[in-house]
Amino acid sequence: MASKRILKELKDLQKDPPTSCSAGPVAEDMFHWQATIMGPTDSPYAGGVFLVSIHFPPDYPFKPPKVAFRTKVFHPNINSNGSICLDILKEQWSPALTISKVLLSICSLLTDPNPDDPLVPEIAHMYKTDRAKYETTARSWTQKYAMG
């Protein structure tokens, strides 16, 4: 079941890729993908290229994929291990969701962080109290880690 669904999603992604994202299997392993997300232009991540790993569980799509940033990113909802705090990857997951929708949600999280549900409270605090410092730091991390 899972491999059939994953294959269908891969075909759909290749046919109609989400804006500024791409994804596909690593080597021949259909259950392990790598995705690339371009930093949204209207965010401090603009110009950055972020690598994201995707691991599908054997019971996908009934369980969510494990998605993590491989590129360091300064963000209240993404920690230093690359873990992402995103409701659709946890309790809001539904089998109707696709990797394409997950990637789009991650892109919008880059544009609009959710400081009220942070994974990194210090960054969330900075985002709320000193937006300029947050944006400067996020921009410098993007230049340092996500621009080749």
Swiss-Prot record:
Protein keywords: ATP-binding, Nucleotide-binding, Transferase, Ubl conjugation pathway
PROSITE patterns reported for this sequence: UBC_1, UBC_2
Keyword Transferase among UniProt keywords: yes
Catalytic activity: S-ubiquitinyl-[E1 ubiquitin-activating enzyme]-L-cysteine + [E2 ubiquitin-conjugating enzyme]-L-cysteine = [E1 ubiquitin-activating enzyme]-L-cysteine + S-ubiquitinyl-[E2 ubiquitin-conjugating enzyme]-L-cysteine
Keyword Nucleotide-binding found: yes
Pathway where it operates: Protein modification; protein ubiquitination
EC identifiers of the protein: 2.3.2.23
GO BP of this protein: protein polyubiquitination; ubiquitin-dependent protein catabolic process
InterPro entries from the UniProt entry: UBQ-conjugat_E2_core (IPR000608), UBQ-conjugating_AS (IPR023313), UBQ-conjugating_enzyme/RWD (IPR016135)
Gene Ontology CC terms: nucleus
GO MF assignments: ATP binding; ubiquitin conjugating enzyme activity
Highest taxon listed in the record's lineage: Eukaryota
Residue ranges of every copy of the UBC core domain listed in the record: 1-147
Residues at the catalytic site: 85
Reported function: Catalyzes the covalent attachment of ubiquitin to other proteins. Mediates the selective degradation of short-lived and abnormal proteins.
PANTHER family (alphabetical): UBIQUITIN-CONJUGATING ENZYME E2
Family: Belongs to the ubiquitin-conjugating enzyme family.
Protein name stated in the entry: Ubiquitin-conjugating enzyme E2-17 kDa
Organism whose genome encodes this protein: Solanum lycopersicum (Tomato)
